[in-house]
Amino acid sequence: MKNSIKIFALLLLFSLNSNAQNNYQIKKATMFSEHAATQLELSDEDQKFIYETYIAKFMNDRENIFGKDLSKEERQAVYKASSKKLRQSMKVRFDQPTTAAIMKAVLELQKRNQ
């Protein structure tokens, strides 16, 4: 009985931690997509696409980095690869100038919030 309570408590802690990390990623993706859509006067559908693309990037980054004890250089390589993949995904829906403008708007927001 005590072991099952301990296991339940441990699982609860893990799920709360995971949920908090997911909430952070959702907040960040929402902020990025709203800012880019506002700056570039994009449609709601375009904003949703940007949001989903950033969520996929953040989840992929987390999956490839979290708990893997990577060096700083290895983490940077993961981030660089995921940023390249993000740009490629954006180019599926947007032309090159729009993609560049979205990335610039998000970068400006990141710098402003640091």
Question: How should these model regions be labeled?
Answer:
Residues 1-25:
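Bacterial Sec-dependent N-terminal signal peptides
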Residues 21-114:
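Charge-rich (acidic/polar
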